[in-house]
Amino acid sequence: MTTNEKALMMHEKWQGKIETTAKSHVNSREDLAIAYTPGVAEPCKVIAKDKEAAYTYTIKSNTVAVVSDGSAVLGLGNIGALAAMPVMEGKAVLFKEFGGVNAVPICLDTQDTEEIIKTVVNIAPAFGGINLEDISAPRCFEIEERLKELLDIPVFHDDQHGTAIVVLAGIINAMKVTGKNKEDSKVVVNGAGSAGVAITKLLLTYGFKHITMCDINGIIGKDSQNLNWMQQKMVEVTNLEGKAGTLADALKGADIFVGVSAPNIVTQEMVASMNQDAILFAMANPVPEIMPDLAKAAGAKVVGTGRSDFPNQVNNVVAFPGIFKGALEGRATQITEEMKLATAKAIASLVSDDELNENNILPEAFDPRVADVVSRAVKELI
């Protein structure tokens, strides 16, 4: 039985991967009177006077909404709200299993930016945080920014920032292995959607100076056509040398490649044209931009992918559960750039110098230390 066949069989068996479990058991009239009427009126009255009391008396303190419109689901594309449910349920499972955070999947049957924003604002009182998921670019940028302005709870688009944080963590350790540094390293980010933009922004914040972004048409620069508003903003802070040409042109003399794009678009010749001991994060799924063995044979020193069957898996699950765990425990109102940097450094620190090598630059998703270390890094900045 293949993995896909087993997944379908198990989803049919589960009929949903999460369920509601009661903390308060109702086994008597007294239990009923305390959990519901008349006793439930007391916490209601307290919250009515002080909305912060909701963190003490309700699930708000440890619950996030996983919100999607189904417009950019995995490699499946715009499959809509209902078809996105298995992914959002899975995300809720990961929140609970890896971070101890309760999560509710909410798939919205609209792809209108204003309707999504209004809906999330209206449901926000029930939650301590909002995790945006699988919303297409460039709409995802506006939706997140507007919600951050409107709400007093953390709003986090994991496709952007979770990916960026883990990529930075991996690069921090890969530079230790290769002896490269952020000031001199030339970085190429291929893919200018939500993940590519967020990765580039975080690398710039960390201190990288030489970053070139590419899309399906090649190098992105001031003369590029058909850029969306966010890509136009990125032109102002990337490709400062004014390069033009193809991805192959961009990779000549580069030190680091980050791919969030399409399968098999990087050749061995391209890798060979990069600087010595190149770092490649080829994260297209399920087939990366170049297979690790081919990249290594062409001269790459460190290669990461999004897959669990290769070394150096770049997996968001080492980031988002701990980030929200820390944000909720610390009652953060937002997740800042400083928190993202601290999280990346914390994740990188989990691989000791003795353990660090070209095939081991990131902690395993099942490392029990991860969520607590990440949550502490977040809470220290609240």
Describe the predicted segments one by one.
Residues 232-302, 307-309:
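Rossmann-like adenosine-cofactor binding region
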Residues 1-153, 375, 381:
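N-terminal ligand-binding/catalytic initiation module
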